[in-house]
Amino acid sequence: MDATVFTKCERCKQPVYEKDLRARFNVCPNCEFHYPLPAPERVRLLTDAGSFEERDGELAAGDPLGFEGYPDRLRSARKKTGLGDAILSGVGEIGGRRVALAVMDFRFIGGSMGSVVGERVARTVELARAEGLPLVTVSASGGARMFEGIYSLMQMAKTSVALSRFMEGSKPYISILTDPTFGGVTASFATAADIIIAEPGARVGFAGARVIEQTTKERLPEGFQTAEFQREHGMVDRIVHRLALKGDLERLLGFVG
């Protein structure tokens, strides 16, 4: 991409060089707005250089329900992102400490959790348990993948059972919530951690605010479902700027890893 290309920030509306945005891992240099970050870039941000080894990349989603248009959506998402599904998982080092890591990618069909995403999360958890590693996940998801129906919903149980076994050990599970994290991902592995971190301004919840208001016929509080609101009400432990995440993880792993 041409380094002279500008984009307008979604929040402050100021022009930003694309190269400056990329250099700051998609954080606006003017107002610190956190844009979504592709999974490969997230891995580069969090792990020590050259330490990440992908696992289970061969897994690929099928079309179990014969849902019209789903195979085309999968092909398009794979071409757009270069990923097999909405997740990148494996083993890497953070501050010299080996960890099991699973990172979601919202670009791939809204980061939705289907059978492959759930399986890779579960396998990452099981790997951490088998090898005695700390576990780190990064969520960015609209929820369950409707194209897979009950197969998608089953992933909530699968990941939760894997985590319950992992929690019998002594290694920590750190979950990072990014914008947006919703639906079945929120209701399963994303909020079942020892330590829950969120990026500033991240939207976190189960159903969207508009759906809740239409159902309850009530106006929601200002800032409802933001990371800041969730921290005030006990769902999030800490809010950490994206560019400080690696250092924060290094300190936390030094204490509890």
Swiss-Prot record:
Top-rank lineage group of the source organism: Bacteria
Gene Ontology molecular-function annotations: acetyl-CoA carboxylase activity; ATP binding; carboxyl- or carbamoyltransferase activity; zinc ion binding
GO terms classed as biological process: fatty acid biosynthetic process; malonyl-CoA biosynthetic process
Pathway connected to this protein: Lipid metabolism; malonyl-CoA biosynthesis; malonyl-CoA from acetyl-CoA: step 1/1
Pfam families xref list: Carboxyl_trans (PF01039), Zn_ribbon_ACC (PF17848)
Keywords: ATP-binding, Cytoplasm, Fatty acid biosynthesis, Fatty acid metabolism, Lipid biosynthesis, Lipid metabolism, Metal-binding, Nucleotide-binding, Transferase, Zinc, Zinc-finger
Location in or out of the cell: Cytoplasm
EC number from the UniProt entry: 2.1.3.15
Domain (CoA carboxyltransferase N-terminal) ranges: 5-257
SUPFAM superfamilies linked: ClpP/crotonase
Gene Ontology, cellular component aspect: acetyl-CoA carboxylase complex
Comment on bound cofactor: Binds 1 zinc ion per subunit.
PROSITE patterns assigned: COA_CT_NTER
Enzyme class: transferase
Residues binding Zn(2+): 9, 12, 28, 31
Disulfide bonds: none
Zinc finger residue ranges, C4-type: 9-31
Cofactor dependence: Zn(2+)
Function per UniProt: Component of the acetyl coenzyme A carboxylase (ACC) complex. Biotin carboxylase (BC) catalyzes the carboxylation of biotin on its carrier protein (BCCP) and then the CO(2) group is transferred by the transcarboxylase to acetyl-CoA to form malonyl-CoA.
Record note on quaternary structure: Acetyl-CoA carboxylase is a heterohexamer composed of biotin carboxyl carrier protein (AccB), biotin carboxylase (AccC) and two subunits each of ACCase subunit alpha (AccA) and ACCase subunit beta (AccD).
Family: Belongs to the AccD/PCCB family.
Protein's UniProt name: Acetyl-coenzyme A carboxylase carboxyl transferase subunit beta
Provenance organism: Rubrobacter xylanophilus (strain DSM 9941 / JCM 11954 / NBRC 16129 / PRD-1)
Upper classification of the organism: Bacteria, Bacillati, Actinomycetota, Rubrobacteria, Rubrobacterales
Gene transcribed to yield this protein: accD
